[in-house]
Amino acid sequence: MTRIPTPLDCVQNIAPYQPGKPIEELARELSLDPTSIVKLASNENPLGCSEAVAQEVSKELNEVARYPDGSGYKLKNQLSSKLGISPDNLILGNGSNDILEMAAIAFLDHDRSAIYSEFCFVVNKLATQSRAAYGIEVPSIDYGHDLERMRDAIQTDTRIIFISNPNNPTGT
């Protein structure tokens, strides 16, 4: 009999992500015309892709079957020049989730803690939990970060303090 391996407990305890409802589903539920709904959830642009972006993407269509430069050499060098910092001080990722998860992989484990605010971006908690690290949730002030209490929550095992700005879901 083949046994399927089970994930670590810290991963099994993560609740599945619940994305926002598609416009079509919401329209059916509420008997609305889908064109009357503007979806502002799920970090989606209700205006769609700009013509300038569409033109630039179309120029690169022949390259989509190839892996991109994983090091981001050109982008890092352009950002380096613009920001006046070394390319070695830049980390690129596929959105904030990717970068936050990379930080958790690099700095967290079961013997370490991370600090984040109540009502923080959900990935801060998920990245901490996925590493079996101890999460220290600091109560918010008017849905914002209480920086003094976050500072006071630092322990000898704290390796990451997540301060999201702007913060999803509060916008602070």
Feature roles, as predicted:
Residues 130-135:
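A short helix-loop-beta submotif of the ANL/AMP-binding
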Residues 2-97, 102:
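N-terminal small-domain helix-loop-helix segment of the aminotransferase-like
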Residues 141-172:
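Active-site phosphate-binding strand-loop segment of PLP-dependent enzymes
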